[in-house]
Swiss-Prot record:
Chief location: membrane
Cellular compartment(s): Cell inner membrane
Record lineage: Bacteria, Thermotogati, Thermotogota, Thermotogae, Thermotogales
Official protein name in the record: Adenosylcobinamide-GDP ribazoletransferase
Reactions it catalyzes: alpha-ribazole + adenosylcob(III)inamide-GDP = adenosylcob(III)alamin + GMP + H(+); alpha-ribazole 5'-phosphate + adenosylcob(III)inamide-GDP = adenosylcob(III)alamin 5'-phosphate + GMP + H(+)
Disulphide bond pairs: none
Protein backbone atom coordinates (compact mmCIF):
# COMPACT_ATOMS: atom_id res chain seq x y z
CA UNK A 1 0.00 0.00 0.00
CA UNK A 2 2.75 2.42 0.96
CA UNK A 3 4.66 1.45 -2.18
CA UNK A 4 1.63 2.23 -4.35
CA UNK A 5 1.19 5.56 -2.58
CA UNK A 6 4.75 6.51 -3.51
CA UNK A 7 3.99 5.63 -7.13
CA UNK A 8 0.87 7.81 -7.05
CA UNK A 9 2.83 10.72 -5.59
CA UNK A 10 5.49 10.25 -8.26
CA UNK A 11 2.75 10.38 -10.89
CA UNK A 12 1.51 13.70 -9.53
CA UNK A 13 5.04 15.07 -9.50
CA UNK A 14 5.52 13.92 -13.10
CA UNK A 15 2.34 15.25 -14.75
CA UNK A 16 1.36 18.16 -12.52
CA UNK A 17 2.84 21.15 -10.73
CA UNK A 18 1.58 20.13 -7.32
CA UNK A 19 4.35 20.42 -4.70
CA UNK A 20 4.83 16.74 -3.93
CA UNK A 21 7.58 15.69 -1.53
CA UNK A 22 8.88 12.26 -2.43
CA UNK A 23 12.10 11.99 -0.51
CA UNK A 24 14.83 9.68 -1.74
CA UNK A 25 13.77 7.07 -4.30
CA UNK A 26 16.53 4.60 -5.07
CA UNK A 27 14.38 2.79 -7.65
CA UNK A 28 13.17 5.94 -9.40
CA UNK A 29 13.56 4.59 -12.94
CA UNK A 30 11.64 1.42 -12.12
CA UNK A 31 8.81 3.40 -10.56
CA UNK A 32 8.64 5.73 -13.56
CA UNK A 33 7.60 2.83 -15.75
CA UNK A 34 4.68 2.13 -13.40
CA UNK A 35 3.17 5.62 -13.24
CA UNK A 36 0.87 5.25 -16.30
CA UNK A 37 -1.29 3.06 -14.04
CA UNK A 38 -2.19 6.19 -12.07
CA UNK A 39 -2.64 8.78 -14.83
CA UNK A 40 -6.42 8.61 -14.51
CA UNK A 41 -6.30 9.32 -10.77
CA UNK A 42 -4.60 12.63 -11.50
CA UNK A 43 -7.38 13.54 -13.94
CA UNK A 44 -10.01 13.80 -11.22
CA UNK A 45 -8.46 16.91 -9.65
CA UNK A 46 -8.38 19.21 -12.71
CA UNK A 47 -11.76 17.76 -13.64
CA UNK A 48 -13.21 18.89 -10.32
CA UNK A 49 -11.54 22.29 -10.68
CA UNK A 50 -13.17 22.84 -14.07
CA UNK A 51 -16.43 21.35 -12.79
CA UNK A 52 -16.48 23.93 -9.99
CA UNK A 53 -15.76 26.83 -12.34
CA UNK A 54 -18.41 25.72 -14.79
CA UNK A 55 -21.00 25.15 -12.05
CA UNK A 56 -20.37 28.51 -10.38
CA UNK A 57 -20.53 30.38 -13.68
CA UNK A 58 -24.32 30.38 -13.28
CA UNK A 59 -24.02 32.71 -10.27
CA UNK A 60 -20.64 34.40 -10.66
CA UNK A 61 -20.46 35.08 -14.38
CA UNK A 62 -17.10 34.71 -16.10
CA UNK A 63 -15.00 35.08 -12.94
CA UNK A 64 -15.50 31.50 -11.72
CA UNK A 65 -14.69 29.72 -15.01
CA UNK A 66 -11.79 32.08 -15.65
CA UNK A 67 -10.23 31.34 -12.27
CA UNK A 68 -10.80 27.61 -12.70
CA UNK A 69 -9.04 27.63 -16.08
CA UNK A 70 -6.13 29.62 -14.67
CA UNK A 71 -5.78 27.23 -11.73
CA UNK A 72 -6.43 24.04 -13.68
CA UNK A 73 -4.00 24.91 -16.43
CA UNK A 74 -1.31 26.20 -14.08
CA UNK A 75 -1.35 23.12 -11.87
CA UNK A 76 -2.09 20.47 -14.49
CA UNK A 77 -2.75 21.28 -18.13
CA UNK A 78 -0.04 23.78 -19.07
CA UNK A 79 2.45 20.94 -18.93
CA UNK A 80 0.40 19.07 -21.52
CA UNK A 81 -0.44 22.25 -23.45
CA UNK A 82 3.26 22.84 -24.05
CA UNK A 83 3.51 19.33 -25.45
CA UNK A 84 0.48 19.93 -27.66
CA UNK A 85 2.01 23.08 -29.14
CA UNK A 86 5.37 21.42 -29.82
CA UNK A 87 3.59 18.43 -31.38
CA UNK A 88 1.54 20.63 -33.69
CA UNK A 89 4.59 22.55 -34.85
CA UNK A 90 6.49 19.35 -35.51
CA UNK A 91 3.76 17.27 -37.12
CA UNK A 92 2.52 20.03 -39.41
CA UNK A 93 5.99 20.88 -40.67
CA UNK A 94 6.63 19.59 -44.18
CA UNK A 95 10.04 18.05 -43.60
CA UNK A 96 11.81 14.84 -42.59
CA UNK A 97 11.19 12.87 -39.40
CA UNK A 98 14.50 13.98 -37.94
CA UNK A 99 13.72 17.62 -38.68
CA UNK A 100 10.29 17.32 -37.05
CA UNK A 101 11.88 15.85 -33.93
CA UNK A 102 14.37 18.69 -33.90
CA UNK A 103 11.57 21.27 -34.11
CA UNK A 104 9.70 19.60 -31.26
CA UNK A 105 12.78 19.37 -29.05
CA UNK A 106 13.64 23.07 -29.48
CA UNK A 107 10.21 24.12 -28.22
CA UNK A 108 10.06 27.35 -30.21
CA UNK A 109 6.46 28.44 -30.75
CA UNK A 110 5.65 28.53 -34.45
CA UNK A 111 2.57 29.66 -36.40
CA UNK A 112 0.83 26.28 -36.20
CA UNK A 113 1.20 26.21 -32.43
CA UNK A 114 -0.06 29.77 -32.05
CA UNK A 115 -3.12 29.30 -34.22
CA UNK A 116 -4.26 25.91 -32.95
CA UNK A 117 -3.28 26.70 -29.37
CA UNK A 118 -5.47 29.81 -29.37
CA UNK A 119 -8.26 27.84 -31.04
CA UNK A 120 -8.03 25.18 -28.32
CA UNK A 121 -8.37 27.76 -25.55
CA UNK A 122 -11.32 29.44 -27.29
CA UNK A 123 -13.17 26.14 -27.65
CA UNK A 124 -12.37 25.18 -24.05
CA UNK A 125 -13.69 28.53 -22.81
CA UNK A 126 -16.87 28.18 -24.82
CA UNK A 127 -17.44 24.72 -23.38
CA UNK A 128 -16.80 25.65 -19.77
CA UNK A 129 -19.42 28.37 -19.97
CA UNK A 130 -22.07 26.27 -21.71
CA UNK A 131 -21.68 22.52 -21.17
CA UNK A 132 -22.90 20.50 -18.19
CA UNK A 133 -20.18 20.78 -15.50
CA UNK A 134 -19.88 17.02 -14.95
CA UNK A 135 -18.52 16.66 -18.49
CA UNK A 136 -15.23 18.16 -17.32
CA UNK A 137 -14.62 15.33 -14.89
CA UNK A 138 -15.09 12.84 -17.72
CA UNK A 139 -12.94 14.94 -20.05
CA UNK A 140 -10.03 15.31 -17.65
CA UNK A 141 -9.98 11.68 -16.54
CA UNK A 142 -10.29 10.23 -20.02
CA UNK A 143 -7.83 12.77 -21.40
CA UNK A 144 -5.24 11.16 -19.11
CA UNK A 145 -6.52 7.73 -20.09
CA UNK A 146 -5.79 8.61 -23.71
CA UNK A 147 -2.10 8.81 -22.82
CA UNK A 148 -2.26 5.20 -21.64
CA UNK A 149 -3.89 4.14 -24.89
CA UNK A 150 -1.18 5.91 -26.89
CA UNK A 151 1.46 4.00 -24.93
CA UNK A 152 -0.25 0.69 -25.73
CA UNK A 153 0.10 1.18 -29.48
CA UNK A 154 3.41 3.05 -29.60
CA UNK A 155 7.15 2.87 -29.37
CA UNK A 156 9.53 5.70 -28.40
CA UNK A 157 10.61 7.98 -31.24
CA UNK A 158 13.99 8.44 -29.56
CA UNK A 159 15.94 6.77 -26.80
CA UNK A 160 15.98 9.75 -24.46
CA UNK A 161 13.55 12.21 -22.94
CA UNK A 162 10.51 11.94 -20.69
CA UNK A 163 8.51 9.80 -23.09
CA UNK A 164 11.27 7.21 -23.48
CA UNK A 165 11.36 6.61 -19.72
CA UNK A 166 7.91 4.99 -19.90
CA UNK A 167 9.07 2.31 -22.34
CA UNK A 168 9.00 -0.61 -22.65
CA UNK A 169 5.38 -0.14 -21.66
CA UNK A 170 3.78 -2.83 -19.52
CA UNK A 171 0.29 -3.21 -20.97
CA UNK A 172 -0.98 -4.70 -17.72
CA UNK A 173 -0.83 -1.15 -16.32
CA UNK A 174 -3.89 -0.40 -18.43
CA UNK A 175 -5.92 -2.56 -16.04
CA UNK A 176 -5.57 -0.33 -12.95
CA UNK A 177 -5.74 2.77 -15.15
CA UNK A 178 -9.13 1.55 -16.39
CA UNK A 179 -10.31 0.53 -12.92
CA UNK A 180 -9.65 4.05 -11.65
CA UNK A 181 -12.13 5.38 -14.23
CA UNK A 182 -14.98 3.18 -12.93
CA UNK A 183 -16.36 5.73 -10.42
CA UNK A 184 -17.52 7.67 -13.48
CA UNK A 185 -19.56 4.64 -14.50
CA UNK A 186 -21.70 5.27 -11.42
CA UNK A 187 -22.44 8.81 -12.61
CA UNK A 188 -23.66 7.93 -16.09
CA UNK A 189 -23.17 4.67 -18.00
CA UNK A 190 -23.75 6.22 -21.42
CA UNK A 191 -21.27 9.05 -20.86
CA UNK A 192 -18.72 6.58 -19.52
CA UNK A 193 -18.96 4.26 -22.54
CA UNK A 194 -18.79 7.14 -25.01
CA UNK A 195 -15.80 8.64 -23.20
CA UNK A 196 -13.77 5.44 -22.99
CA UNK A 197 -14.49 4.60 -26.63
CA UNK A 198 -13.40 8.12 -27.63
CA UNK A 199 -10.17 7.73 -25.66
CA UNK A 200 -9.32 4.47 -27.40
CA UNK A 201 -10.09 5.91 -30.82
CA UNK A 202 -8.13 9.14 -30.26
CA UNK A 203 -5.22 7.32 -28.64
CA UNK A 204 -4.97 4.81 -31.47
CA UNK A 205 -5.11 7.51 -34.15
CA UNK A 206 -2.51 9.66 -32.42
CA UNK A 207 -0.14 6.71 -32.09
CA UNK A 208 -0.42 5.93 -35.80
CA UNK A 209 -0.03 9.55 -36.90
CA UNK A 210 2.95 9.98 -34.59
CA UNK A 211 4.59 6.82 -35.92
CA UNK A 212 4.21 8.12 -39.46
CA UNK A 213 5.44 11.63 -38.67
CA UNK A 214 8.34 10.98 -36.28
CA UNK A 215 8.69 7.20 -36.02
CA UNK A 216 7.11 6.85 -32.58
CA UNK A 217 6.05 9.01 -29.65
CA UNK A 218 7.76 11.50 -27.38
CA UNK A 219 6.80 13.16 -24.11
CA UNK A 220 5.38 16.04 -26.15
CA UNK A 221 3.11 13.69 -28.07
CA UNK A 222 1.90 12.05 -24.87
CA UNK A 223 1.15 15.42 -23.29
CA UNK A 224 -0.59 16.62 -26.41
CA UNK A 225 -2.67 13.44 -26.58
CA UNK A 226 -4.02 14.19 -23.11
CA UNK A 227 -5.48 17.51 -24.19
CA UNK A 228 -6.66 16.21 -27.55
CA UNK A 229 -8.44 13.34 -25.83
CA UNK A 230 -9.90 15.76 -23.30
CA UNK A 231 -11.31 18.21 -25.84
CA UNK A 232 -12.70 15.41 -28.05
CA UNK A 233 -14.56 13.90 -25.09
CA UNK A 234 -15.90 17.33 -24.12
CA UNK A 235 -17.08 18.11 -27.64
CA UNK A 236 -18.87 14.76 -27.93
CA UNK A 237 -20.47 15.03 -24.49
CA UNK A 238 -21.60 18.53 -25.39
CA UNK A 239 -24.09 16.94 -27.78
CA UNK A 240 -25.18 14.21 -25.38
CA UNK A 241 -25.99 16.14 -22.19
Amino acid sequence: MQDSLKDILLTFSFISRLPVKLGELSDWEVRMKRIPAYFTIVGYIPGLIYFTGSFLSLNFGIIAPLLSIVLGFYLFDLFHFDGLLDTLDGFLNQSSKSRRLEIMSKGNVGPFAVFYGVLYVIVFWELITSIEPVAFVFGSVFGRYTMDVVLVFSKPAKNEGLGAMLFPFNRFLLVPATLFTLPLLLIDVKLFLVSIFSSWLVGFLISKVSEKQIGGVTGDVLGGSCLIGQIVVLLILNYLI
